[in-house]
Regions:
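Structural signature of FAD isoalloxazine-binding scaffolds in flavoprotein oxidoreductases
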Residues: 61-80, 135-157, 181-188
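Short, conserved charged micro-motifs
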Residues: 40-43, 102, 208, 235, ...
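Glycine-rich N-terminal segment of FAD-binding domains in flavoprotein oxidoreductases
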Residues: 23-122, 129-137, 224, 338, ...
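Non-transmembrane, aqueous-exposed alpha-helical and coiled segments at domain scale
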Residues: 87, 108, 154, 351-352, ...
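Short, Lys/Arg-enriched N-terminal segments with co-localized hydrophobic residues
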Residues: 1-8
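Activity-critical C-terminal alpha-helical subdomain
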Residues: 385-439
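C-terminal substrate-binding/cap subdomain adjacent to the FAD-binding core in PCMH-type
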Residues: 148-328, 332, 340
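Substrate-recognition/cap regions that form aromatic- and gly/pro-loop-enriched pockets
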Residues: 288-408
């Protein structure tokens, strides 16, 4: 409550500075607010010259940074159930700060499913959507593509509700936190389904060159794990969609790759206890689409990540470029992952998925200086192909030349105008987003 002109019990000033999950970034915020209700949130926004929502802190760059107050919604209660599934429309309304793994249990209990999930269930809904985070699958879009509505608090502390059909929604879904503090997200669901996960090992590069489209079309969601060395793809994870109760089957040979006979972790030699069940054992979508289980911490954060979203028609050129960089990249990698993403059904202004895309993802060892030296060369090879850096991961261009990234998005000026309208005083600017919008 308010007492003597200051917000009591809401802001931890003087607390140790927050760091992100990976530990590679210490945020610049001067305090952290944990508003308990809409009134407290509006008050924090109005009182702060600079303010920014902070999610599960799984971004590797400074997309969510601010010099002012960070807002964390872990104690926020808008008087509604955190997860509400509308039985008529199938739309699920979600408290924005929740993690996907917590949301999906409720959705599954209601007999519904989200079409896709990211590899980690530990990430917040609002933060994932705002950065166009994604899983894999030729026919399934990013997490942002499921959004049909948003509620947010904008620069003057007022509330906005956007739904499908509102002119602002396509600009507000992938918004990098620049329009306000999102408090609720509405997601489309589908009837529940099961998934079986089969892993193949030892896919030669020749097979990737000749049969990539067939490989990615062979299951609902396909991920290729490689270190970009001469040996090719070490593991292919194939997640096949089944009707509940159906068992499905696998294939003995996958263009030279053979079925794994034990559970595997994407990183060689790591205990797969953290991973979702493989070996063709069917289970509900929410326990198979992520690579990692919610009840295990997937790693201690001792890693860095980059990712480039390449137009699908240029994928083979991107693979060739990465293989050429192999001698420099492989020694720094924990693992690389290649995924596919379907285009957004309705264009989202700052989404990299305006057409079919292939994600070239890199999980680096925690060697920030070495990674920083190789990123410019990787981007010099990939960005001319039309690749866009993932908004939440490490990128040389996002830090040093955000204008070059802005130029990859035809609607970026419209987005800037939208941000100006929702936040005329620039309260929600910070990190690279400020430089991106400064043009």
């Amino acid at each position: 409550g308010l007492e003597g002109g200051k917000v009591v019990g809401v802001t931890d000033f003087g607390a140790p500075r927050l760091a992100n999950w990976a530990g590679n970034l210490t945020y610049g915020s001067s305090g952290v607010a944990h508003p308990a209700n809409p009134e407290e949130l509006a008050d924090v926004v109005r009182r702060s010259a600079r303010v920014k929502a902070l999610g599960s802190r799984h971004s590797f760059g400074d997309v969510a940074d601010t010099t002012g107050t960070h807002v964390v919604l872990d104690r926020y209660d808008d008087g509604r159930a955190p997860v509400e599934v509308d039985p008529a429309s199938g739309v699920v309304s979600v408290a924005a700060g929740l993690r996907y793994g917590d949301v999906t249990r409720h959705v599954q209990a209601a007999g519904r499913a989200l079409a896709n999930l990211a590899s980690l269930p530990h990430i917040s809904v609002a933060g994932s959507v705002a950065t166009a985070t994604h899983g894999s699958g030729d026919a399934v879009g990013s997490l942002a593509s499921a959004v049909v509505g948003l509620e947010l608090v904008i620069g003057d502390g007022g509330r906005r509700t956007l739904r499908r059909g509102d002119a602002d929604l396509p600009g507000a879904v992938v918004a990098l936190g620049a329009l306000g503090v999102v408090t609720r997200v509405e997601l489309e669901t589908v009837p529940t389904f099961d998934v079986r996960q089969d892993v193949h090992v030892g896919l030669p590069w020749d097979a990737v060159t000749a049969h990539y489209d067939e490989i990615t079309a062979s299951a609902y969601s396909v991920s290729l794990f490689t270190d970009w060395g001469p040996d090719g793809v070490q593991q292919v994870w194939r997640k096949s969609r089944l009707a509940p109760g159906e068992r499905g089957g696998t294939r003995a040979d996958l263009f030279g790759a053979t079925p794994a006979t034990t559970m595997l972790h994407p990183l060689p030699g790591i205990d797969p206890v953290h991973c979702t069940p493989q070996l063709g054992e069917p289970g509900p979508w929410n326990e198979r689409l992520p690579h990692f289980r919610l009840d295990f911490t997937p790693s201690n954060g001792a890693e860095l990540q980059s990712e480039y979203l390449v137009p699908r028609g240029r994928a083979q050129e991107a693979f060739a470029a990465m293989r050429d960089l192999g001698p420099r990249v492989t020694p720094l990698l924990q693992v690389g992952e290649i995924r596919t993403v379907a285009p957004d059904p309705e264009p989202l202004w700052l989404s990299p998925f305006d057409g079919p895309a292939v994600g070239v993802h890199l999980t680096w060892k925690p060697l920030p200086d070495d990674v920083a030296r190789v990123l410019p060369d990787a981007e010099a090879a990939l960005l001319p192909l039309g690749a866009r850096p993932h908004w939440g991961k490490l990128s040389h261009a996002l830090v040093h030349d955000p204008g070059s990234v802005a130029a990859l998005y035809p609607r970026v000026d419209d987005f800037g105008a939208l941000a100006q309208r929702y936040d005329p005083e620039g309260r929600f600017l910070g990190g690279y987003v400020e430089r991106l919008l400064a043009g």
